[in-house]
A protein has these predicted regions:
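N-terminal Rossmann-like FAD-binding beta1-loop-alpha1 element of flavoenzymes
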Residues: 5-32
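Glycine-rich FAD pyrophosphate-binding loop
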Residues: 25-45
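Glycine-rich phosphate/pyrophosphate-binding beta-alpha loops
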Residues: 47, 195, 299, 317-319, ...
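Active-site substrate-recognition segment that forms the wall
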Residues: 48-49, 54, 58-98, 251-369
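Rossmann-like flavin
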Residues: 91-209
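Helical element adjacent to the flavin cofactor pocket in flavoenzyme catalytic cores
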Residues: 160, 185-239, 244-246
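C-terminal lid/capping helical subdomain adjacent to the catalytic/cofactor pocket in oxidative enzymes
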Residues: 362-396
C-alpha cells in the first residue's frame, strides 16, 4: 500500500476542522494552515444553534422590502451601511436580488434543510465516536413571532416544507412557564425538538485535540498569500506560505477560509457579512431560558449551553472588511435580553465576526483553479458543517 494522500486545508474554523475530521477518518495526511490557530474568528463565539428550523434561505421579496425599510435605522436587524461601497458589495447585492428574482427560495431552502438534517445525524455519530465535550444542550429551538403577519407566514412555511421531515411544529401551552421566557408579546411560536445548541469554539478545539491524538494531523499558524502579493488571511503570525507552494507540496489543497475565501479566490462571490454576539457566564446566566430561542422579527438567536453560559447573537451588517464592534449593533442584543428573558444580567463579553455568505445562501463545495473549496455557508456554517465536510471528502 502506498503513502496516504497529503492534503492541506486553509482555514481552521468549523469548515476546516470538520473537513479534516472526515479526511482523517479515511487515513489521509492532513495539515491545517491558519494564521490565528483553531477557531479564532467566526467559529469563536457564534450563536451556537444547530438549527434545522432556521435553514431557510434569505432570498425573498419580503426580505428585500425589509432591507430597504431598514436602510435608515442603525439598530435594524440588517445594517446595509450605504456609506460603504465596493465592487464586491455591489456584485453580492446584485447576485442576491438575481437569486430572488429567479424564485430559488423553495429549491434552495430544501437543499439547506437536507444538508442540515444530514449534519444533525453526523454530529450525533461524531459525539458517540469521539466522546468530545462542547457543552452541547439537546434543548430544542423555540422560534417566536411577535406580529400576526410574520406568524401567518410562518404557518404557511410549516405546511410548505412539512414533507422534508424537519420536525418543526407549532408550539403549544404556556411558553413562559415551559421555557422560562417573557411571552407577553408573542403572537405564535414553533418548536423543533431535534435541534440543539453547542459551543462551536470548544467543539473545534476539542475535535482538533482528538485528531492530534488519533490521526495524521497537524495545525500550522501560517498566513496564506497569493503569488507573493500581500493579500493575507488576517493573522498574527509572520510566516507566510503562497497558495502555489501549498499546491506543489500537497496532493490536494482545500480552501475553508470563510469570508477570506474570496480574497484567495476572487472569482467566488462570497461576501463578509458581519454578525455580533454577547455572552453571559456563571451567575449572569442563571435565569436564562430553558431552551434556545430564535426571534424571527428581531433576527436574534439565544442559546443556553450546558456550562452555565448564555449566548445571544444576530444582526447582519454589510460593511466590507470592517471588524469594529459597534455599540449601536450590540445594544439591540442587550435590549433583547432585558425585554424577553427574566435575566437581570449586566456583565457580558462581546464578539463580532465576518460570516462568509453567497448571494443565494448556498455553500460552495467544488473545485476552483485546481483547489477544492468548502465555504460560503454563512450563518448556517455550524448547522450544516458536518454534512458539507462529508460531501467534499467524498468528492475528493
Amino acid at each position: 500500500m502506498g503513502n496516504p494522500k497529503s492534503i492541506a486545508i486553509v482555514g481552521a474554523g468549523v469548515a476546516g476542522i470538520t473537513t479534516a475530521y472526515f479526511l482523517g477518518k479515511k487515513g489521509y495526511k492532513v495539515r491545517l494552515h491558519d494564521p490565528n490557530g483553531v477557531a479564532e474568528e467566526c467559529s469563536y463565539a457564534n450563536g451556537g444553534q444547530l438549527s434545522v428550523c432556521n435553514a431557510e434561505v434569505w432570498n425573498t421579496y419580503s426580505n428585500i422590502a425589509k432591507g430597504i425599510k431598514w436602510l435608515t435605522q442603525p439598530d435594524a436587524p440588517l445594517a446595509f451601511r450605504p456609506d460603504v461601497w465596493s465592487w464586491s458589495k455591489i456584485k453580492w447585492v446584485a447576485g442576491f436580488i438575481g437569486a430572488t428574482l429567479t424564485n430559488s427560495y423553495d429549491r434552495n431552502t430544501r437543499k439547506t434543510i437536507e444538508y442540515s438534517l444530514r449534519s444533525r445525524r453526523l454530529m450525533k455519530k461524531l459525539m458517540k465516536d469521539t466522546g468530545i465535550d462542547f457543552h452541547h444542550n439537546d434543548c430544542g429551538i423555540l422560534h417566536i413571532y411577535k406580529n400576526q403577519k410574520s406568524w401567518d407566514k410562518a404557518r404557511k412555511t410549516l405546511d410548505r416544507f412539512k414533507d422534508t421531515k424537519w420536525g418543526r411544529v407549532e408550539a403549544k401551552g404556556n411558553l413562559a412557564k415551559k421555557y422560562n421566557i417573557y411571552s407577553k408579546d408573542i403572537v405564535g411560536a414553533t418548536f423543533t425538538k431535534g435541534d440543539s445548541v453547542g459551543d462551536i469554539h470548544t467543539f473545534c478545539r476539542h475535535l482538533s485535540y482528538y485528531m492530534e491524538d488519533n490521526f495524521d494531523y497537524k495545525v500550522y499558524c501560517n498566513k496564506i498569500v497569493i503569488n507573493k502579493e500581500v493579500k493575507y488571511l488576517s493573522g498574527k503570525r509572520d510566516h507566510a506560505r503562497t497558495l502555489q507552494e501549498l499546491k506543489e507540496q500537497y496532493d490536494e489543497v482545500i480552501i475553508c477560509a470563510g469570508a477570506y475565501t474570496s480574497v484567495l479566490l476572487p472569482s467566488l462571490n462570497i461576501y463578509p457579512i458581519k454578525g455580533y454576539s454577547i455572552t453571559f457566564k456563571g451567575a449572569e446566566a442563571e435565569d436564562a431560558p430553558f431552551t434556545s430561542i430564535l426571534d424571527d422579527d428581531a433576527k436574534i438567536v439565544a442559546s443556553p449551553f450546558n456550562n452555565l453560559t448564555f449566548r445571544v447573537a444576530g444582526t447582519a451588517e454589510l460593511a466590507d472588511w470592517n471588524h469594529d464592534i459597534r455599540e449601536d449593533r450590540i445594544k439591540p442584543l442587550v435590549d433583547w435580553v432585558h425585554d424577553n428573558t427574566f435575566m437581570d444580567a449586566e456583565k457580558y463579553t462581546r464578539w463580532a465576526c465576518l460570516r462568509p455568505m453567497t448571494p443565494n445562501m448556498l455553500p460552495i463545495i467544488s473545485k476552483v483553479q485546481g483547489m477544492w473549496v468548502n465555504s460560503g455557508a454563512g450563518h448556517l456554517g455550524w448547522t450544516m458543517g458536518m454534512a458539507l465536510a462529508e460531501k467534499i471528502t467524498k468528492d475528493i
